[in-house]
């Protein structure tokens, strides 16, 4: 389904990874600098950043001062002009960000700390639009996205609830879902960016079965021959035989039964209570868990992947990735937000982006 290794006949067999810069006023530019400062990455892929030279140059200056990272920015207007050399960050420069456009921010001051803005929303949306276009034209083998602000893109007139929905719309994909992963702990979502009330209404047999299929296929793509899939219930104690809700009986179990008839490996043959399914997954019993709504999957992943330092008031670790399943192109993302409050200080943690690039490489080489 994915279209990988399409330009790899000119230069070598390393996949070209298009990385969006994210919101120019967020943490995307600086974690991109830190990720691409690992020169070993260039032994496995050819990265190109989709964004604006102005923000990337500032982030490079900060990285040099704070972390002693010395990288050059190479603006290009075509993928074919990229150098793909360690120490040089190729930026597909859309030229959307002019620092002087920001009210009260002189040219010499950092272009950060603005928070959600029309300018940041418009720019970050256009980066995503461009990288999707490049992937659909097979000019890049995979896409990796830094964070944008949902509020900011909507302020700019782009009415989407997140990257996943943008990708689905622009690739004309009807059936898709979000998968989160932290190392070997993985979850696939039946619903994501909707209210909890609506999320309950979306737990239907057809949708649950659809996500089971996508989860099963995703695990096979990364080399797991017979994936073991856990299915989280929706209600406390999986509804206790209908006492606390009937979704397990009426929707989830019928989906599981059909999946079992198709030969999909669901060890229990039934939904597992949400308060125990993740402990079993962390113990290695499942390769992936199908969850019923956003926070049911996000909370356990972030409890494992995020480590907060209360003394220093920053994140010591921000690990985990977001993958959109069901698309005709590869899309992997960081699993955190824009970090407006600390953006530009050079302290943002790049682990999630590094993980995302690694996973994109793995999918590209499939």
List where the protein language model places each region.
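Contiguous, glycine/small-aliphatic-enriched amphipathic segments in soluble metabolic enzymes
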Residues: 2-163, 208-230, 234-322, 328-366
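Flexible loop/hinge segments that line or gate small-molecule binding clefts
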Residues: 158-186, 192-195
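Active-site glycine-rich loop that binds ribose-phosphate moieties when present
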Residues: 165-174, 196-220
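Well-ordered beta-strand positions
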Residues: 180-181, 322-324
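Substrate-binding rim/cap in mid-to-C-terminal beta-strand-loop elements of soluble/periplasmic
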Residues: 190, 325
């Amino acid at each position: 389904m994915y279209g990988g290794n399409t330009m790899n006949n000119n230069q070598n067999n390393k996949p070209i990874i298009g990385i969006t810069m994210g919101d120019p006023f967020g943490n995307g530019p600086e974690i991109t600098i830190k990720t691409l400062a690992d020169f070993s990455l260039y032994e496995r892929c050819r990265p190109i950043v989709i964004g604006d030279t102005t923000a990337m140059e500032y982030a490079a200056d900060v990285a040099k001062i704070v972390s002693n990272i010395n990288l050059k920015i190479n603006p290009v207007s075509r993928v074919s002009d990229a150098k793909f050399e360690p120490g040089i960050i190729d930026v597909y420069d859309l030229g959307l960000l002019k620092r002087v456009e920001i009210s009260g921010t002189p040219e010499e001051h950092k272009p950060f700390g603005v928070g959600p803005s029309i300018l940041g929303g418009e720019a970050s949306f256009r980066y995503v639009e461009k990288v999707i276009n490049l992937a659909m034209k097979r000019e890049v083998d995979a896409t990796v996205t830094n964070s944008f602000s949902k509020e900011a893109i909507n302020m700019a007139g782009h009415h989407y609830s997140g990257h996943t929905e943008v990708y689905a719309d622009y690739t004309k994909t009807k059936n898709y879902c979000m998968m989160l992963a932290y190392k070997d702990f993985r979850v696939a979502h039946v619903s994501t960016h909707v209210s909890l009330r609506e999320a309950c209404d979306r737990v239907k047999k057809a949708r649950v079965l659809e996500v089971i299929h996508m989860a099963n296929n995703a695990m096979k793509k990364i080399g797991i021959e017979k994936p073991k899939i856990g299915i989280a219930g929706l209600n406390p104690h999986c509804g206790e035989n209908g006492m606390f809700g009937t979704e397990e009986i009426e929707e989830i179990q019928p989906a599981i039964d059909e999946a079992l008839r198709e030969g999909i490996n669901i060890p229990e043959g039934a939904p597992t209570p949400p308060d125990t399914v993740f402990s079993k997954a962390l113990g290695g019993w499942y390769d992936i868990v199908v969850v019923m709504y956003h926070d049911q999957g996000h909370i356990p992943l972030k409890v494992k992947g995020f480590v907060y330092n209360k003394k220093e008031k920053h994140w010591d670790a921000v690990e985990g990735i977001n993958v959109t399943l069901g698309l005709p192109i590869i899309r992997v993302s960081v699993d955190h937000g824009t970090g407006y409050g600390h953006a530009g200080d050079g302290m943002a943690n790049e682990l999630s982006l590094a993980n995302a690039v690694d996973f994109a490489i793995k999918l590209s080489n499939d």
